């Protein structure tokens, strides 16, 4: 209801921030519980969010759109800028720590972590400004002829209804973050009992919190608003990195233990391939069933290699 009231691209932004709040709450609760495995939970969850959004949600949205209309059409300027932001944030926070030499292992020094946090937050703020103010038209759905899609036939909710929805959303977020204290250990225990790698904890968290985004993106794609689907996907990835990393960096001052952010070789390859394939997908402003299959294959490879590294 809030998203319908404020319209695009503000609606996608509201949902992305709400999802990120839940994600941060789950990560923090897991890290507070401590243990040797807690050091990599933030990295695993953020990377999983990037792979789920850029491959899973994008691939599924393109699949639905191309099955419905053969060719999915979107705004290359807005999608390209969003993808560039995702790639830059992911490289700064997840790739560079694997190659820096200030500390042993895939970790930032204190100064490097502070720089990465400030840079991530600044770039996120710049992206939001461009998306909602400077070049809002680049993030609006378009028709096959490149013209903006008309407004929804459904009347937007009243201002009073939107305010009630906003209040309920805030209350729900507080409740969900509070429940994270109970849910996080259960996820960790379930993964350990199943004998799965620790990285699966991050995948499980990301899959759970991104489910609303996935449903909203598929619904938009079914309605011919592929740009809205891409706004949701890339916006969630940007929020996941741009808000989660600064928050975890700040909390690391009080949390004991290291903070591992650098990716391993397999995940570096998957991230590089995702960036390359995504660029080839968004630059033309049109996509077919083939592009959706490529993204879904990359997502399947990520899930499989997380379970069986």
Describe the residue ranges of each PLM region:
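Hydrophobic alpha-helical segments, chiefly the membrane-spanning helices
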Residues: 1-309
């Amino acid at each position: 209801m809030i998203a319908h009231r404020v319209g695009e691209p503000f609606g996608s932004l509201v949902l992305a921030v709400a999802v990120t709040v839940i994600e941060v709450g789950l990560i923090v609760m897991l890290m507070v519980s401590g243990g040797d495995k807690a050091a990599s939970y933030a990295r695993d969850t953020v990377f999983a969010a990037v792979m789920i959004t850029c491959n899973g949600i994008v691939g599924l949205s393109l699949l639905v759109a191309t099955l419905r209309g053969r060719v999915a059409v979107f705004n290359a300027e807005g999608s390209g800028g969003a993808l560039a932001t995702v790639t830059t944030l992911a490289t700064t926070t997840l790739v560079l720590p694997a190659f820096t030499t200030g500390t042993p292992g895939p970790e930032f020094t204190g100064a490097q972590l502070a720089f990465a946090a400030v840079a991530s937050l600044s770039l996120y703020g710049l992206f939001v400004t461009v998306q909602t103010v400077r070049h809002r038209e680049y993030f609006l759905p378009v028709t096959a002829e490149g013209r903006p899609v008309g407004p929804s036939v459904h009347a937007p909710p009243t201002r009073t209804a939107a305010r009630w929805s906003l209040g309920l959303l805030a209350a729900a977020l507080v409740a969900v973050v509070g429940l994270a204290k109970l849910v996080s250990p259960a996820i960790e225990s379930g993964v350990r009992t199943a004998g799965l790698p620790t990285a699966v904890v991050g995948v499980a968290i990301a899959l759970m919190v991104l489910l609303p985004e996935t449903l909203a993106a598929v619904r938009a794609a079914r309605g011919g608003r592929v740009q809205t689907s891409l706004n949701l996907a890339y916006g969630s990835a940007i929020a996941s990195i741009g808000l989660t990393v600064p928050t975890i960096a700040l909390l690391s001052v009080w949390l004991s233990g290291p903070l591992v952010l650098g990716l391993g070789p397999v995940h570096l390859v998957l991230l590089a391939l995702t960036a390359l394939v995504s660029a080839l997908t968004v630059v033309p402003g049109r996509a077919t069933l083939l592009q959706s299959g490529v993204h879904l294959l990359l997502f399947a490879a990520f899930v499989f290699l997380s379970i069986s590294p």
